[in-house]
A protein has these predicted regions:
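N-terminal periplasmic "start-of-domain" segments of outer-membrane beta-barrel proteins
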Residues: 29-57, 88
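N-terminal periplasmic accessory domains that precede
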Residues: 64-67, 87-90, 102, 118-123, ...
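Short acidic/polar hinge/loop motifs at secondary-structure boundaries
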Residues: 107-135
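Periplasmic-side early beta-strands and strand-to-turn transitions of outer-membrane beta-barrels
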Residues: 152, 160-162, 185-267
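Outer-membrane beta-barrel signature, preferentially recognizing the C-terminal barrel domain
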Residues: 260-281, 319, 374-376, 416, ...
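Gram-negative outer-membrane beta-barrel transporters
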Residues: 388-392, 481-483, 503-588, 628, ...
């Protein structure tokens, strides 16, 4: 009852706060990710969500995972657990490795991981200009892993001034310090951007410990340093050359699993990206040529002075992954209403992995995995034609041919018609296929299988979107259905107890997304969403097919509400409520049998306020999370944060 009163009060107060200055952008936004060239929401049938820099600025105490969790169809498990805990991104209920993360359109992977998905903790939020979430199967333009969709992180670039300095400084609960600064500028044919960020927190005790006494339990903190630099050259008016480098390193502490505290378990994770992006104007066409090198390194050391589980004494694991990515594509109008995107990309990856441990049963030293044997490459050729007719009919038709060094070739396609009626009602349908290639670990590790095929998916979605006159509101209703076959499964023979990865399972997910954004009182904005997601796997058990719900740690129902606006010219205030439904989790008994667990639903209420002065050059802010102190669980056996607050200042000169 207390929670309901607090939430109702927040909504009523926020309604009274909204007045005067207009700070909202056009609701018919322009996106880049959907077609690889700028296009309005009303002119594409794809389902895209935009998070602007203004929205990110009004999330001063949040990290990337928390911002993503407030979007329709997104759930990031671990977003509100210990700040340094791993974050699992679930888009429309799909597996973590079925959502592709890109930075400025470049796909990012961690070849050393079992699923090869990139760790979003390595992406500082301060250097992000905007985020475009492209839902549905997108392998035609983006290749492997884009089964559920693509999250494109677009970094901040140069300033229009010769010299511009911006940054932020904040402090909050758990002794959390966050500082960042950037120097950007542009003059004549040259522009530059240099950014640095530091983030440190004591964190919380990651595991819900039932063994260690309170005074012995430790907090599992982490710190992060991030650096980014780029320069842009325009030797002629039709060409831009932009080399860049990004580096991020995390150091933190871990616990020894669910309900088990650990005092001496440390990890480091760092990521280095270096590359160059080139753009050339050729008449009305634009040619993009880019290269990116990505290196990830992870180390885990458990030097157990006192074993918390009575088994482990010492362990050390080192995992290094390297990825080369090159792409060239051209965007050109072929007729008044038709735009063609065509290109090719090349991906090459390898990994080194070593592990050593000592337990009560003695040392364990599996053979190290070397980049000389754990490597793969693939090349793709793709094309997509976009029609934007004057009568309101829009369509995209595309395909990709991909060749992989191990399994051979595969083909994917997309068909995406939509119709815009009277500039207000958009009806859309998407039919597309997608794939995920086997990872290096699944192919070549001790459990590897070189005969694995890629996971293959067919996605269907359809719906309607409404654009109110005078930019007053936008609303969208979407149904999606995703069928994946040849799902890679970790199989253990019940007779020999030998384990190997095989293609076996079928996965089917479907759901509904309802979203609306309403503008009122000039600057007032209300955003609401509701999502329902269901998913079932079909697998072989005792020689028979069996089907059951398997969206572990993912809610069937989510609800979000955000209200915000300006009070006068300088003060902004807003509030957010997120309701997460029941979830399933699993644990293991003493005989290593799976045991199902039900996680209770929960509601989180947050509030944000900022005050601007010196012509918006300085903004002080306060960001409150979980105001009611809700107790809940994201992962069985692990803690979540209670009420936490952050205060700070943004500056821009």
């Amino acid at each position: 009852m207390k929670k309901k009163i607090f939430i109702a009060a927040a909504v009523l107060i926020s309604n009274q706060l909204l007045a005067q200055q207009d700070s909202t952008k056009n609701l018919n936004e322009v996106f880049i990710s959907a077609n690889k060239f700028p296009n309005k929401t009303s002119l594409t049938g794809k389902v895209v969500v935009l998070i602007t820099r203004d929205q990110l600025d009004k999330s001063g105490g949040s990290d990337l995972s928390q911002v993503l969790s407030e979007q329709a169809g997104m759930y990031v498990n671990g977003a509100n657990s210990n700040p340094g805990k791993d974050k699992s991104v679930y888009l429309r209920g799909a597996k973590v490795d079925h959502t592709l993360i890109t930075v400025d359109g470049v796909p990012l992977y961690d070849p050393s991981g079992i699923g090869s998905n990139f760790d979003i903790r390595l992406l500082p939020i301060d250097n992000i200009e905007r985020i475009e979430i492209l839902k549905g199967s997108q392998s035609t333009l983006y290749g492997s892993d884009a089964i559920a969709g693509v999250i494109n992180i677009i970094t901040r670039k140069d300033s229009k001034k010769p010299v511009n300095i911006d940054g932020m400084l904040s402090y909050g609960t758990h002794n959390t310090l966050h500082a960042s600064t950037a120097l950007r500028g542009m003059k004549d044919k040259f522009d530059y951007s240099v950014y640095y960020s530091y983030h440190k927190t004591n964190g919380i005790n990651e595991a819900t410990d039932t063994i260690t006494t309170a005074h012995e339990a430790d907090k599992d903190g982490f710190d992060q340093n991030s650096l980014y630099a780029s320069v842009g050259f325009r030797p002629v008016s039709t060409a831009t050359i932009r080399p860049y480098i990004r580096y991020s390193k995390i150091r933190g502490k871990l616990d020894n699993g669910a309900f088990t505290d650990e005092l001496d378990y440390d990890y480091t994770s760092d990521d280095l990206q270096a590359g160059v992006k080139n753009e050339f104007l050729i008449g009305k066409a634009k040619l993009n040529v880019l290269y990116n090198y990505n290196s990830t390194k992870r180390e885990y050391v458990d030097d157990s002075v006192k074993s918390r589980n009575g088994f482990d004494i010492y362990s050390k694991g080192n995992y290094t992954g390297r990825e080369h990515y090159a792409e060239a594509y051209i965007v050109m109008p072929v007729k008044t209403a038709v735009t063609l995107t065509a290109g090719m990309d090349y991906r090459s990856s390898n990994t080194d992995q070593q592990y050593h441990s000592v337990s009560v049963y003695g040392p364990y030293d599996p053979l190290p995995l070397s980049k000389d044997s754990l490597k793969q490459n693939q090349m793709g050729v793709y094309a997509a034609a976009v029609l934007n007719a004057r009568n309101g009919f829009n369509a995209e038709l595309g395909g990709r041919f991909n060749h992989h060094s191990t399994y051979g070739s595969n083909f994917v396609f997309n068909v995406n018609p939509s119709f815009l009626l009277k500039e207000q009602w958009k009806f859309f349908v998407n039919i597309s296929s997608a794939y995920k290639t086997p990872t290096l670990y699944q192919l070549y590790s001790e459990f590897g299988n070189k005969t694995l095929d890629p996971e293959k998916a067919i996605g269907i979605e359809g719906g309607v979107q409404f654009f109110a006159k005078k930019n007053k509101a936008v609303a969208r209703a979407t149904y999606f259905n995703r069928a994946v076959r040849d799902v890679i499964f970790f199989y253990t023979d019940p007779n020999t107890f030998q384990s190997v990865y095989i293609n076996q399972d079928k996965q089917n997910d479907h759901g509904i997304e309802l979203e609306t954004t309403i503008r009122f009182c000039k600057s007032g904005v209300i955003k609401m969403f509701y999502t329902w997601t269901d998913g079932r796997v079909t697998t072989r058990s005792n020689g028979k097919d069996t089907t059951y719900f398997n969206l572990i740690r993912r809610p069937k129902n989510t609800l979000g509400l955000t209200i915000g606006g300006n009070i006068g010219k300088r003060l902004y205030a807003g509030t957010t409520v997120n309701a997460i439904g029941k979830r399933a989790d699993i644990t293991y008994d003493a005989f290593f049998n799976q045991v199902g667990i039900k996680l209770d639903p929960y509601i989180l209420w947050g509030a944000y306020a900022q005050y601007s002065f010196l012509k918006n050059k300085i903004k002080v802010f306060a960001d409150l999370h979980n105001i009611t102190g809700t107790k809940y669980t994201e992962v069985y056996g692990f803690n979540t944060q209670g009420f936490n607050a952050t205060g700070g200042v943004h500056f821009n000169f």
